[in-house]
Amino acid sequence: MRPRICGRSSPRAEHSEGKIVFKDEQTQRHINENNYVAFKYVDKDGNKGGFPVNPNGSTDSIAGLTDATGRVLGLMPHPERFVRITQHPHWTRLFAKDKREGDGTTIFTNAVSYAQKNL
């Protein structure tokens, strides 16, 4: 099991063109059995769903995959576009509530922390 580098967050999906589609069931089974799924599109309760939760119709709500080492990550949402709370479409309400960084920052700070401790 790979380390969890990001909890539930809301990195932005900028478009709906990119999505995971497997060439066959054997490939999909291999990806799942080997824990290559790094991120999924889920609602606030952690449940998979259709649009708008899964904005591109990605198979099994998969948003990101890793390689066998966990060091290579392919990710469809764009956390780099949400490192400041002011980049969120509802930033004025969120900022007034808790004055925090954008959710996209979490993936980067947790990845750096993991690398510093383990690599």
Question: What are these regions, as identified by a protein language model?
Answer:
Residues 1-119:
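Amide-donor transfer/coupling interface in amidating biosynthetic enzymes
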